[in-house]
Amino acid sequence: QNPKWSGPQRYRQASDLAVNASVVAAGIHYFLNLIANPKWRAQPSDPNNPEAVRMAEFVDSVMADINQPWASIVRQAGMFRFHGFSVQEWIAKHRDDGMIGLESVESRPQHTIERWAVDDFGTVLGMFQRNPQTSQILGLPRSKVMYIVEDTLTDSPEGLGVFRHLAEPNH
């Protein structure tokens, strides 16, 4: 196995390829724009139920009130298809209406995730990230993140993204 494509450095190697190989970059941008550009809005589970309609309207207002475009959040999350997983930490805030909303949804780069907290059944309970600025290890509980994994071919918490297929054989 090519050492550049193993361990945490594989995420940097893949990111470098995504930035510097035009055909790869074009494919990534095309896919991410397809998933991010539709108008995102919540649908009430029962359009005849006033509470369901109210909750859908609340979700729409949370998406509109966040400090970054929802399409940007979707694009960052969509990188799970390429890297195998993605982690976004949501930051809560008190809204003017007294409800809890989202201040932001911050991407946690794959190369910063060093360990996984997994129970005996394989359920991911959280992950540990190395802070790129301080090198401190920080715990991220699953309840505080959006964790998306491509687990069709593996039960690893890191999933198996399509970048894996770009690795050159080492011979």
Please annotate each region the language model reported:
Residues 1-67:
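Extended, helix-rich architectural segments
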